[in-house]
Every structure is written in structure tokens, then in C-alpha cells.
Amino acid sequence: MVKVSMVVQTDATNPGTDISKIIKSTNTIYGQYHFMMENLVCVTKPTEEGLEVHTCTQHMDAVQLMTSRALKMDQNKIDVHVRRLGGAYGMKISRTSQVAVACNLVAMKLNRPCRFIQPLTTTMRAVGKRLPCSNDFEVAVNNSGVIQYINTDIYEDNGYMLSELLANFGNDVYNNCYDKSKWNYKCYNTLTDTASNTFCRSPGTLENIAMAEWVLEQISYELDLDPLEVRLANLDTKYNELKEITETLKTNANYTTRRAEVDKFNNENRWKKKGLRFALLRWTPVGGQTLDVNLSVYHGDGTVVITHSGIEMGQGINTKAVQICAYLLKIPVEKIQIKANDTIIAPNGYVTGGSITSQNVGRGVKRCCEQLLERLDPVKAQMDNPTWEELIVNAFNLNVDLQAHGFVSLAETQVYDVFGATLAEVEVDLLTGEHEVKRVDLIEDVGRSVNPEIDIGQVEGAFIMGLGYWTTERLVYGSNGEVLTDRTWHYYVSQAKEIPLDFRVYLRKKSYSTDAMFGAKASGEPPMCMSVVIPFAIREAIAAARSDSGINRTKWFNIGNIAFLYIFRVT
């Protein structure tokens, strides 16, 4: 039995009347496992103060709080330590608390160390995935494909219970970058018989942005119009940055020439076809954070130590913090070190996630540096162009406090939009069902990047994770809700032969967010949403083949995100 409850409803404010066609359809996309290098682990040992917990979590405060409640221990007797994570993608926000509580219970009861390592198969069976999602919509358009009104009902599958309000994360982007005044939007939470689903890279936003892009794609098919022109015709005038981004991408990707080449290839080949498709993006970060940052300078050699509430899990948060500190203090990065995190130096810290922690840690580091420099300025004024080491020694001798604290609160939430555009070229072998991603060109607006190499790496990683989601990763459930694809023998993530042969990432130039974040924007989740361009390109290739078989090219067919070889046989 499926239980349904409404999350939010938004009504159109300016529907149109120039209606030449009404399209009704349903699109469904499915779950995704957070395929991490490091599974759920915890090591706990009793101490004279209580418990020393070493675990792999994105949320130290949650582990400490849940352990306190479950074991009826005071929080000040539970010290949670995290050095770094071997990947997380959202699973380690809440699900690590279950593992940690079990491990901590054993350590407390037996008064001896306990190590808990959950194997991959158990994790894939017991722990929830990305929310599957269905969209029932009715859209009315004119002859140019401009939306007059759209009624869209989004159903998010939370599993057997509602443990996190993930559907709310997509409420600001359900229309993506298109004219919001035409959209009647309803979002529902549903309960089914699978494990309770959880955060997964771009939770809520991927589903809503993909569904919006799906609608625009179907409009272009059924009216036989250029898909990019349909998108631009429906673009909200508030987001004109996307026109500039799209033109830049068309130029960089040599779109006009390649469009003609793809059409020529499809006309000359019967058993291999190509698709060339666009996807646009407007992504907005959700919520804020509570973060502590501490900066200490050692008087003997002037070296600097930073601790903060953020968790390093491959996104480069520590590297960016060091860069910001070195820039503001005008010292070499070699003199700065980031220490491991724990609930002693960073109590009550918010979860690391949502692609906002690197920016907020940077804000905290900036405040620490500003405090320290303010204290050092009077000392420096009395000296003749001192070195950093000389300045610190003199300041210490004058009893200057060489430790600073920066606090970032929920009240300081920054609101901005991340824009992007992607063009993908895919070739499909109609005899085997195999496909090859020939080339991907992607532009993302990351603001003024603190570290372009890290941001490009984040863009590439997120897109490839999305590529796997749309093409190779297929979750299969038994009739009782049991996961049958619980290992790499059955569940396939993108590997060397699935990634694009030619992958070109561009960062938008002359972009800026706010001074508080050095002009930087999020980079780790938005590209995940743009990966929907891959099934669009695959569908165009299949449509070309169907056309050769006498099937009307404007006849829509769904392929969703079920593993491509499977859906190819169905199509």
C-alpha cells in the first residue's frame, strides 16, 4: 500500500491562453545507491571520561546526540572524532548514527573497544537510497512551444517511513530556470515498502530539475522543434545569465557544425545512431549552517593550525581553508595545517552537506584572520617591516592573544543561484544496445573560484555520478521490497569505458556571489542535475532509429533512468 501526503502547493500567477496543443504524460525515475569507497564504520573505546568514538560521519553532532539519548549518557562524556571520509554523498549524514550507536552500546556494556564495519551487501540492503520520483503533468503550449500553463504533480518515494524532509529541498527549483508564473506545482511524500530513503547528492533538486527538463524535452519532440530554442523561449527573464552561458557553450562546443555532422551521420548509418542534446540548470542551495572555526598561531615558529566543524570527504574543504588563510595572513601555505575534527573543538556543528560547507568554513577562517590581524596591527606598527615569524614572537612577548575564533550562524544563510548548461553527444549501437558518450561540454557558474582545479574536479565527479545514475545503475527489488542488486555483480557504477571520451568543463567567467564567500559558489551538486542530458541524447539516437523503421519521430517514448541495455530491449 502506498500512502500519500502533500508537502507543498504553488499556483500559477499568469497562465496564458494561446493554446495549440496539450500534452499529458508521466515520467518516473528511480533510486541510486551512494557507491562510496568507504562503507559505514565505527571504532569506539571506553576512556576514563566516557567514550572515544571514531566514526565516518558527515554530522558529528548527530552521532554524539543520538548516542547520548540511546545510552542515557551525558553528551560531555561522548567525544566524536573524524579525520576524513572515503566518500559519503549524503548517506553519512544520518545513517552513520545507527552504526555508531550500535558500536558504542557494545563498548559501554563490555567496557572494551569495539570495531564495527558494515559490509557493502548489508549496507545496500538495509540503508535507503536516493528518492525515486514520479511526475504526472499536463502542459499546454502554443505553436512555438511556449508554455501557457502546466499542472505538475511530483511524488517522492521516501520508503517505508518519512525520516528526512527531502522533498522540501526541491521546492525552490521545481521550474528549474523557466517561467514560474505558468506552473501549478504540487509535491507529495509517499510511503512504500522499501528501506527508508535518505540524502543523496542533490536530494530533491535533481528530481525536480530533471522533471522540469523532461517536460521541455517532450514539448520539443511532440512539436518537432529545436530543444534549445524551446528552452530559451520558456526561460524566466530573471535568469538571462543562461542566455550568455548557452551562447558561450554553443561557441565552445562548435554546436552548429556538430549538429549538422550528427544529422549527416544518422542519415548515412542504419545500425548506429547519434544524439546531440542540451540541458539547462538553475540550482539554489538550501538552508544554512552553524559552524565553528578556530585558528591558533604558535609563537616559536609562526606556524598556524586551523580546526573547524566541516568534514573533509574529497570536496577540498581543507585545501580551500588553507588557501584563504594563507591569502589573508600573507604567509606560505606550508605554514598552515588543518587538524582532525572532533566534538571538543567543534561542538554543536551542523551537518557537512548541501555544497555550502566549504564556503561557510571559508567565512569562518576569514573572521579568524581578521581578528588576528586586528590584534597584530599595533605590534606591526612598532616594527620595521618584520617577517611573519618576527611579528608573532614580538606579539607573544607583548601578551597578544594568538588564537581566534570564527562563528557562522544559521541567520547568515546566503541565497544565490548557480547556473549551468551542458551539451552531450552520444552514439548508440542498435544491434547490441551499447552506447558511447562521445563528448560532453559543460559550463557551470561557480562564481569566483577559490580553487578552480578543485571545482573542476567536483564538476567532473558529480556529472559522472549522474551519468551512472541515468545509464548503468539499476536497483531491483523483490515482491516484498527486498533489494536484489546488493553487490557489484548486479549493480554497475560508471567505470573507465562509460565516461565521456572527450569531457570539456568550463567555469563561467566574470561571476561573483558575495564578499562573505570571496565570490565563490557551490560546485559539487549542480552538475549532478545536468547529467540528465545523457538520456536526452540517447533518446534522440533511438528516435532516429525508430524513424528509419517508420515510427513517427514526434511520437514520445519514455526511457527513464533504468539501466540502458535493459530499457533498450524494451524500446
Question: Where do the language-model regions lie?
Answer:
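Metal/cofactor-centered catalytic core regions of large enzymes
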Residues: 238, 414-420, 441-496
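Generic long, charged, amphipathic alpha-helical segments
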Residues: 334-340, 493-521
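Short conserved micro-motifs at the rims of enzyme active sites and ligand-binding pockets
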Residues: 289-292, 449-453, 515-519
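A glycine-rich dinucleotide-binding beta-alpha-beta segment and adjacent secondary-structure elements
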Residues: 271-283, 486-503
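Short terminal or interdomain "cap/linker" segment that borders an active site or interface and mediates
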Residues: 562-571
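Short, contiguous acidic/charged loop-to-helix segments that flank catalytic cores in large enzymes
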Residues: 309-313, 454-458, 525
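Structural alpha/beta core scaffold segments of enzyme domains
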Residues: 1-443, 533-550, 569
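C-terminal structured "cap/appendage" subdomains that terminate the fold
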Residues: 518-535, 539-558
